[in-house]
Amino acid sequence: MKVIVSNKFYYPRGGDCVCTINLEELLKQKGHEVAVFSMQHPENLETPWSKYFPSEVKFAPGLGIIEALRRPFGTREVRTKFTRLLDEFQPDILHLNNIHTQLSPVIAEIAHRRGVKVVWTLHDYKLLCPRYDCLRNGLQVCEECFSDKRKVREHKCMKNSALASFLAYKEAMKWTRMRLEAVTDAFICPSRFMADKMVQGNFDKQKLNTLCNFIDIAKTRKDDYDKENYYCYIGRLSPEKGIGTLIEAAKRLPYPLKIIGGGSLEETLRAAAAGSDIELLGYKHWPEIKEIVGKARFCVVPSEWYENNPLSVIESQCLGTPVLGSRIGGIPELIDEGKTGMLFESGNAKELKARIGQMFATPFEYRQIALDAQKRYSAERYYAKLLKIYTSL
């Protein structure tokens, strides 16, 4: 088959980008012809298809802001360049990932009109929530926009800005559920939780497929699964990730905690962790992540938003490291309590503190956790299910 894989960014910027790049490589390995459609960016990977990428847009005051504000609604440049790609490549399938704002769903409409089958992997809740993360103002879990998109304006959910929230509302009103559903042949939800939310948002259940993300298993393989006496966190240092709750619990405990990542709360957390056995390590590359997470007794994923299918859980388990996760979003689906980790109530520092102690006291079969996870999240397993979706269209 000939497949166009599309994502707004084409470099390892976040989980959606990593999944897109992994998907491209997997399809090529399986003998499919693959083209890429993304936005121009100085950090993009090299590809012969970049000649069709629309220009980079930046949502900041200055030159190009008008084009940036128009882009979410489907601009002439995006339409023209994507049409040229279709003319040259003649795909069977367009596989969308994270395309809103910088590319827009106009490419799904163009492909659909040409008879190209459209598959869309959903990495966030943008089709339900104009903010994409189901967080009112980035702080409080909220589902009001599932049924009434005007709520994004009422609560000023976009940067607490009336203008930004109005634009998000207009974008949602252009790309309505009925419009997107009409041009999409299959949606892929990486978690059952997301699929349930899509049903709650009145999307056609017959078009929803649940398929957990995969990772490059080879990079997680180890010779030994020996552990050291510390636990860890890996991820963005921002409020919705629950890192503040983790620090609150960890400060009251005698166990060393290693934190990998950066973000808006970094300096605040450094001040809060001063004098404790909490170490903020900043950003790390994979070899260091593999070493730190792989030797940790367990990894904590204390999220306070609707995590979909977090790579932090998947990668930790593939390294033989159990996970202590919050009971929210798609996290519980990935953890077999007592066997591959434990769960706690999201945002509950008291319960988290107790669970940390229990995790240190519980003997886990680290090697078995790794072997089972490497099977569950393998490219082979993912591809077998993806191919069934492709061939059913």
Label each residue range with its predicted role.
Residues L127, F146-T220:
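Donor nucleotide-sugar binding/catalytic pocket of nucleotide-sugar-dependent glycosyltransferases
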Residues V313-I314, I328-G338, M342-L343:
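Short acidic/histidine- and often glycine-rich active-site loop of Leloir-type glycosyltransferases
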Residues A361-T391:
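A charged, aromatic-enriched C-terminal amphipathic alpha-helix characteristic of glycosyltransferases
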